Amino acid sequence: MADSIFPVLGAWWRSKGARQGDGATLPAGASTTPYDSAAMPVGSRKFTFEIDYRDTSESRLDLRVNWFNDNKVKVNGPFDITTVTLPQGQTKVVAEVELPASTAPRWLPSIAVPTSSGEAAISSLKVYETPVKAQPVFVWDGVREGAATITVWDGAREVPASIEFQA
């Protein structure tokens, strides 16, 4: 679980509903989005939404994208990415999404509660770039390439690790 790249949901603009601490209660037909100054670079285009909510009744959320230029001025949107269901009887949903193709360098999420859905009572929302899955590591022994296992010593035992190169 990473920290969110956007302000807490309660600080976002809302068409309807009310702030509830760091979260918000959003009735059917409501939408919410961070203010334009929070527009972030699109990066890898893959993001994770972690939604903690109260499970009083099932509801749905449309996860959407708004596109921005480098001056954090909205270019267009919102455009639907996916719909997630917040099932009754649970309190957390995690959705991994890929932003659709666009030449815009920045984006903001937007969340809408469809008019046919129940109220969404979200206590916490985190949005962060989806971590890259660890790739296999290979080494060259001078004759052939072979798989390698990377570990580090924590003072008591070897612990699996991974290597990530950043350009």
Language-model features: where?
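Extracellular polysaccharide-targeting segments
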Residues: 2-16, 96-98, 112-154, 163
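Secreted extracellular polysaccharide-interacting domains
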Residues: 20-42, 74-78
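Extra-cytoplasmic beta-strand recognition segments
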Residues: 33-61, 94-97, 125
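Extracellular beta-strand-rich recognition modules
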Residues: 49-51, 105-114
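Beta-strand acidic-aromatic groove motif in beta-rich domains, primarily in extracellular
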Residues: 58-68, 107-109
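Residue-level signal for glycine
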Residues: 72, 156-157
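Extracellular carbohydrate recognition and processing domains
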Residues: 74-104
